[in-house]
Amino acid sequence: MSVRSLPAALRACARLQPNDPAFTFMNYEQNWDGAAETLTWSQLYRRTLNVARELSSCGSVGDRAVILAPQGLEYVVAFLGALQAGRIAVPLSVPQGGASDERATSVLRDASPVAILTTSPVIDDVTQHVSAQSAGPAPSIIELDRLDLDAAAGSGAGTENYPATAYLQYTSGSTREPAGVMLSHQNLVTNFEQLMSGYFADTDGIAPPDSTLVSWLPFYHDMGLVLGVCAPILGGYQAVLTSPVSFLQRPARWLQMLATSSHAFSAAPNFAFELAAKKVSDDDMAGLDLGNVLTILSGSERVQPATLKRFADRFARFNLQEKVLRPSYGLAEATVYVSTSRPGQPPELVEFDAESLSTGQAKQCESGAGTQLVSYVLPRSPIVRVVDPDTCTECPDGTVGEIWVCGDNVAIGYWNKPEESERTFGGKLASPSEGTPEGPWLRTGDSGFITDGKMFIIGRIKDLLIVYGRNHSPDDIEATIQEITRSRCAAISVPGDRSTEKLVAIIEYRRRGDSDQEAMDMLVAVKREVTSALSNSHGLSVADLVLVAPGSIPTTTSGKVRRAACVEQYRQQQFARLDV
């Protein structure tokens, strides 16, 4: 389907396949076994137009409409209605205290919305939170479930005069206050075409017509929004959705949805693969077959090869093919997608000498002797280069640098942050190679390298640990620890003696043992095993291993570890240690 915007794609779907199911939401709060709620394309389009009409009296084209609603079909309709009305949609999670409140407060202050789209079950929390923001005129609060969304839409609902920015995707804020990435309809349509070309490279970017997008990812994060809401509309595919809470309550629900949907295409962060491999039983999968699954992409956080292997091995008996697992790299500033692994084969894992990587050079080594990294296709679109961030020159093959991205999927910039936008989105190459544009380039802040025509990602540059003058990826260190503890952990560096940095690891640990002495013995054994593994695999001596209760490590709303907050809590001795 060739369209220029998401509203145009929705209109086309409603015209071409009005009575086909568009979105099905599995409500496990209403029924433990799941109650299916389905909208056809014509119903979805009618509800979208009615929300747009309601918004037409709130501000004007280009004003912001924030969605603060639980995961469900109302959220989908709210997002689409805002776009249809020419308002800039701002997807958010319902404020529930703590970090979520701080995030919502920051976004509401930054976006200055004219309207809040919500539902009656959460109206009290939303109203209380919005009322506490005193700056500027109060936004209109619209309860979607109190509107007659199925009324005849008539004409005049919405606009064709769309603003340059379609929606603001606020970053998770793991290292700073959330920033609103300004994404256009062109960004979205382009990135959809790019990701289809990547995942379906062997079929000219075309998925089977009966493909189903299956997702439990939150709509307020980039991967959940694009996969769960936008991609089904842009491709004309059915979506079967549920909530993150429903997945966390019972991970088997995700696998069951994959097995019962035709040609399922899904996505999840690394922790979900680990959780599913550990928690889903054979009884949960009785009578189910995963042989029809098209793709399960792993993204949003560092892909751990060992986790994917455990997942593939666990569900092989239910005919899951390892080749459908597709490690993927992307970021909100590039809409969502940049690259994935090669199609038609299992993820390719390559080992590199850890000592060489710490000095900025990639040298392959024998299996089991180094750092294992996933290989990604070096895409034609978008254009990707590895660049020396100091000289702005392209790095030679095998040299570690910063990943830069150029293409029509790259966002306009950050909302209300011109200086940060210029730093991030205004990269210019010095003496670019033939066929490589000078700029503007998106500076991703991620380190990586290219070798043999393949791309490898190391991690966030800001998160790199410098220990005794060498660079170490916290993701690699955490992966080593997690192979022992199978729990969340954070590798951080803190100032030591004589202006050096020392390595500290914070590890969430569930106490085991029948007596206090047995529990302490097991805890000491874990610390000994972790210390040995870090020495053998990374040549690192750990200055302090801090074992804490599950849930102690600060994270973002998407589950990423907030390492800067960990450093501060450690320095202030705020972690309640289990090992003292």
UniProtKB/Swiss-Prot annotation:
GO terms for cellular component: plasma membrane. Disruption phenotype: Deletion of the gene leads to defects in phenolic glycolipids (PGL) and phthiocerol dimycocerosates (PDIM) production. CDD domains: FAAL. The keyword Nucleotide-binding applies. It catalyses: holo-[mycocerosate synthase] + a long-chain fatty acid + ATP = a long-chain fatty acyl-[mycocerosate synthase] + AMP + diphosphate; a long-chain fatty acid + ATP + H(+) = a long-chain fatty acyl-AMP + diphosphate; holo-[mycocerosate synthase] + a long-chain fatty acyl-AMP = a long-chain fatty acyl-[mycocerosate synthase] + AMP + H(+). It comes from the Bacteria. One of its GO terms (molecular function) is ATP binding. Its EC number is 6.2.1.49. GO terms for biological process: Actinobacterium-type cell wall biogenesis; fatty acid biosynthetic process. Keywords: ATP-binding, Fatty acid metabolism, Ligase, Lipid metabolism, Nucleotide-binding. Belongs to the ATP-dependent AMP-binding enzyme family. PANTHER family: DISCO-INTERACTING PROTEIN 2, DISCO-INTERACTING PROTEIN 2 DIP2 -RELATED. Involved in the biosynthesis of phthiocerol dimycocerosate (PDIM), a cell wall-associated lipid found only in pathogenic mycobacteria. Catalyzes the activation of long-chain fatty acids as acyl-adenylates (acyl-AMP), which are then transferred to the multifunctional polyketide synthase Mas for further chain extension. This is Long-chain-fatty-acid--AMP ligase FadD28. It comes from Mycobacterium marinum (strain ATCC BAA-535 / M).
